[in-house]
């Protein structure tokens, strides 16, 4: 495992009563799991003291696109209501697949939180170590949170179109190869098959082992093998902006600079007939 942005279950168990630590449960249903009630799953059992960071609820509901970043003031109010304090060390976890914790990690950092770590192995790893869970909601006093949005963290569709057309940045697509190569339909209806012209495919699952990032040597080999250069700006994308954060986390672990996330992702690009797509049918 690469450890730059991670803490282990043993460390968290030792520090769980530290008043400067706050734990955030960011489990999330993936496309095709719409029948899951992750809020109820959280209530049924979570790491002691963890509040539920509902990525769906914390998205911009004025946008037709899924999981878009909310307005900074909206996010700040939600964090204060959860009892989250931006000056504390926030520990984020998901169910143990590293699917959604990186998105929560990225959101918190994009809105100005400096100390954010991910629990390696997530909830599954915590349970494998026979550590205790608690049930029910966690009620905390109102938190202190004033969002300081970093506009450099995210790009819009016009930025991606320019990067694709002018080759000013590399575009990395985190979706599975079959979706990237237009071999299967997207899980969300109404989207075209294929990928942004010029994009490189680095499926997020190839970067992960048992809910943790692979070693830095392994990550380097994967990125280099897919043609990624660390010397050029990078835009990460995926289906809806969630698993792109896994790629961004891996690149951050490798100290790669100038990496931004395309929040609209394929949910936006694939829905627009006026944007180019590869492979051309």
From Swiss-Prot:
**GO MF annotation, one:** thiosulfate-cyanide sulfurtransferase activity
- Reaction it catalyzes: 2-oxo-3-sulfanylpropanoate + [thioredoxin]-dithiol = [thioredoxin]-disulfide + hydrogen sulfide + pyruvate + H(+)
Q: Which keywords does this Swiss-Prot/TrEMBL entry list?
A: Cytoplasm, Repeat, Transferase
Q: Where is the Rhodanese domain?
A: 17-135, 165-278
Q: Name one Pfam family in it.
A: Rhodanese
> Residue ranges of region Substrate specificity?
238-244
Comment on protein domains: The N-terminal region is the non-catalytic domain; the C-terminus contains the active-site cysteine residue and the CGSGVTA motif probably responsible for substrate specificity. Contains two rhodanese domains with different primary structures but with near identical secondary structure conformations suggesting a common evolutionary origin. Only the C-terminal rhodanese domain contains the catalytic cysteine residue.
Name of the molecule in the record: 3-mercaptopyruvate sulfurtransferase
Q: Which organism is it from?
A: Escherichia coli (strain K12)
Q: What's the name of its gene?
A: sseA
């Amino acid at each position: 495992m690469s450890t730059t942005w991670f803490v282990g279950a043993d460390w968290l168990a030792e520090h769980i009563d530290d008043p400067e630590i706050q734990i955030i449960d960011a489990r999330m249903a993936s496309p095709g799991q719409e029948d899951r009630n992750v809020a109820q799953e959280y209530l049924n059992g979570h790491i002691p003291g963890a509040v539920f960071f509902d990525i769906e609820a914390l998205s911009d509901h004025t946008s037709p696109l899924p999981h878009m970043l909310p307005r900074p003031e909206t996010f700040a109010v939600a964090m204060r209501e959860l009892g989250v304090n931006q000056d504390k060390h926030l520990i984020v976890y998901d169910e143990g697949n590293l699917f959604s914790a990186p998105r929560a990690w990225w959101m918190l950092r994009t809105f100005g939180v400096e100390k954010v770590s991910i629990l390696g192995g997530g909830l599954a790893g915590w349970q494998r170590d026979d550590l205790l869970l608690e049930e029910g909601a966690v009620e905390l006093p109102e938190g202190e949170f004033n969002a300081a949005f970093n506009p450099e963290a995210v790009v819009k569709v016009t930025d991606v179109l320019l990067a694709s057309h002018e080759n000013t940045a590399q575009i990395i697509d985190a979706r599975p190869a079959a979706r990237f190569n237009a071999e299967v339909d997207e899980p969300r209806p109404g989207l075209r098959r294929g990928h942004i012209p010029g994009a490189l495919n680095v499926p997020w699952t190839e970067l992960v082992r048992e809910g943790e990032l692979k070693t830095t040597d392994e990550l380097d080999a994967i990125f280099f093998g897919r043609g990624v250069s660390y010397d050029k700006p990078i835009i990460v994308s995926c289906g809806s902006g969630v698993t792109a954060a896994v790629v961004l986390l891996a690149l951050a672990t490798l100290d790669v600079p100038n990496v931004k996330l395309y929040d609209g992702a394929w949910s936006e690009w694939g829905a627009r007939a006026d944007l180019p797509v590869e492979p051309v049918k």
